[in-house]
């Protein structure tokens, strides 16, 4: 089943590690309690940040290949989060002061039931933090997160309607810079609901703007394909950095290929990207290049970190960035 053997490891990037520490600061604004549950805790990196701040840490994640790592310093159940799995926590009702779900909500086929399970394990004075990673998707012409693992996308208004049906309240909506800009919805069991003061952020989502967004996406894909194909036809080496799901989505939608892709995660090395069959190699491969190369940061939300890593290995580089528009950036 999906996510049982999961190759995405959140602790791979320094950008995320720093953000996880910052996220603890966000949580601390709302909660004095110190018992936290991380839903879809992956390798436990976010829980590490909570543990450093004195929290009692719990997690749940179905990835069997990551369980030894995530449970090393935390109480982690290897399972999907649902009404059956929460029974595995002792005294699960009203147990946790903090419940977090970062970039997992879109994976769920039953979001109302997901929230209702969160409500069961959340303490009466606690807060639930739902992070979604598409806050600037339309304004920045981002379409690389639209793929089979992401079942739904929520505006502030649609999230408000869903939250109400689950018997919860929106206390705050925070925009953070991570993953190309994300929303963090701060929810609780008690009112009042403060969502109305944030609804103006949805003003961009008009039918006209959405049609323009679709045209922009098609244009970016075509322009990127044209640039890369032209460079490769001239004999240049064009590689990708980051064998991320969003990068693979962009490649397959845009219909281009690359000489190879490098990734920081050893679990992906010497595999191939789905559909395009591009080899995935260790980052050190870049050191072996003896001529000018072009690098496409496929985890574009980590552009600055990727640029710094590549520059430390090879300075004879031009970067091809595609959001919000296509541009070539010299090292």
Question: Regions from the language model: what does each represent?
Answer:
Residues 1-69, 142, 147, 152, ...:
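Extended interfacial segments that mediate partner engagement and assembly in macromolecular machines
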Residues 112-127:
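A short glycine-rich, Lys/Arg-flanked "PGG" loop and its adjoining helix->strand segment in the class I
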Residues 168-179:
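Conserved S-adenosyl-L-methionine
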Residues 130-152, 156-158:
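Short, glycine-/aromatic-enriched active-site segment of Class I SAM-dependent methyltransferases
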Residues 100:
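A conserved beta-strand element that flanks and buttresses the S-adenosyl-L-methionine
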Residues 72-88, 280:
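Conserved SAM-binding strand-loop segment of SAM-dependent methyltransferases
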Residues 125-133, 318-324:
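Conserved beta-strand signature within the Rossmann-like core of class I S-adenosyl-L-methionine
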Residues 26-27, 33, 49, 188-331:
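Hydrophobic, well-ordered beta-alpha structural blocks that scaffold small-molecule cofactor pockets
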């Amino acid at each position: 089943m999906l996510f049982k053997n999961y190759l995405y490891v959140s602790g791979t990037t320094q950008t995320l590690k720093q953000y996880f520490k910052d996220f603890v600061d966000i949580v601390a604004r709302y909660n004095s309690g110190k018992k936290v549950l991380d839903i879809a805790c992956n390798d436990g990196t976010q829980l590490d940040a909570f543990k450093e701040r004195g929290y009692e840490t719990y997690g749940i994640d179905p990835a069997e290949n990551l369980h030894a790592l995530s449970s090393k310093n935390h109480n982690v159940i290897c399972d999907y989060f649902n009404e059956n799995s929460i029974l595995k926590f002792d005294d699960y009702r009203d147990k946790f002061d903090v419940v977090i779900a970062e970039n997992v909500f879109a994976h769920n086929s039953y979001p109302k039931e997901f929230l209702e399970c969160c409500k069961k394990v959340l303490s009466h004075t606690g807060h639930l933090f739902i992070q979604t990673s598409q806050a600037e998707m339309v304004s920045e012409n981002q379409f690389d997160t639209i793929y089979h693992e992401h079942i739904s996308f929520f505006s502030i208004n649609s999230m408000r309607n869903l939250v109400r049906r689950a018997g919860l309240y929106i206390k705050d909506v925070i925009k953070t810079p991570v993953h190309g800009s994300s929303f963090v919805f701060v929810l609780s069991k008690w009112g009042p609901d403060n969502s109305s003061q944030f609804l103006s952020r949805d003003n961009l989502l008009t039918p006209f703007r959405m049609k323009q967004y679709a045209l922009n996406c098609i244009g970016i894909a075509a322009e990127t394909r044209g640039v890369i194909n032209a460079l490769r036809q001239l004999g240049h080496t064009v590689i990708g950095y980051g064998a991320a799901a969003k990068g693979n989505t962009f490649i397959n939608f845009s219909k281009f290929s690359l000489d190879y892709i490098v990734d920081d995660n050893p679990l992906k090395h010497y595999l191939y990207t789905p559909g395009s069959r591009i080899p995935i190699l260790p980052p050190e491969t870049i050191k072996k290049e003896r001529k000018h190369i072009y690098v496409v940061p496929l985890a574009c939300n980590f552009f600055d970190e990727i640029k710094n890593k590549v520059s430390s290995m090879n300075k004879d580089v031009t970067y091809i960035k595609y959001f919000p528009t296509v541009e070539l950036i010299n090292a």
